Amino acid sequence: MNKIIVIGSSNTDMVVRSERLPRAGESVIGGNFMMAGGGKGANQAVAVARMGHRVLFVAAVGNDIFGNAAIEGYKNFGIDTSHIIRKDEPSGVALIMVDGAGQNSISVALGANNSLTPEDIMPALEQIAEGDIVLLQLEIPMATVDACVEIASAKGAKVILNPAPAAIVSDTTLSKLYLITPNQTEAQTLTGIEVTDTNTAELAAQKLVSQGVERVVITMGSQGAYLYQDGKGVMIPAHKVEAVDTTAAGDVYNGALCAALAEGTPLTEALHFAAKASAISVTRAGAQPSIPTRAEVDNF
């Protein structure tokens, strides 16, 4: 079975739930408070591990209590933490507000994540073999993302970029990807096309393909996900559930997708698997605490 390497952010999530999100300049009395592991990279690595796969996680944390707790938590999930770098900066922290409908607003202090350099990730990249899967996001410096994509793709790895948070990515990097997985907002940032339905998703996907991407999956919340490859598009429906917290839905989707692909599952079938994992996660509070087990996904 091919290896899965996740390179990305490690945060501590501080979550406050309230009936609605505050407007600018407004204070809202919240309800429950929760603190747990987070960060897009970490969430995706945990999702891979929860699907029953070994995963190597490459990240940067501070020499502080948050960094200590994060590494211990990853080890408890069975994640290989041997390439997590310690930095003389605070560990990343995310402040998350969740409303009564499960929608969220997030502000991230990147801290040590912002100092993960191309040099830091080189020892991990030396382990990559042809057919391995490398999963990246954009909560680390773009120079590090670009270097990873160049080296991993040259080694024959399947490089998957979840371009979150939304940012412009160079055509050079896009052309080396096996797959890109933006949500609607991220797809608009990358293409300038507002994605609201299947037709606009196809236009955005075609624009990305024209920039060199081979395959595009645009996640569209409750509408599902739009897959475009080989000049054809198809909608992968989402499962209807009652959402409690959507914080890590995209991360669970990407992690489960990589797990399925590592098993040799065809892309369309892997996306159906990812949709099930993501659907389960939004019915639970928190990021990493919401991630289902492999058995739960198989039985969904």
Residue ranges and their predicted role:
Residues 1-60, 65-75, 243-244:
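Glycine-rich phosphate/adenosyl-contacting loop at the front of the ribokinase-like
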Residues 1-4, 168-173, 198-300:
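Conserved phosphate-binding/catalytic region of the ribokinase-like
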Residues 5, 56, 135, 160, ...:
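Structural detector of well-ordered beta-strand residues that form the stable sheet scaffold
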Residues 26-28, 35, 50-132, 150, ...:
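Conserved N-terminal subdomain of the carbohydrate kinase-like
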Residues 46, 93-97, 224-227:
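Short beta-strand scaffold segments in enzyme catalytic cores
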Residues 49, 153, 262:
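Gly/Ala-rich phosphate-binding loop of Rossmann-like dinucleotide-binding domains
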Residues 133-203, 224-225:
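Conserved beta-alpha-beta core of the PfkB/ribokinase-like small-molecule kinase fold
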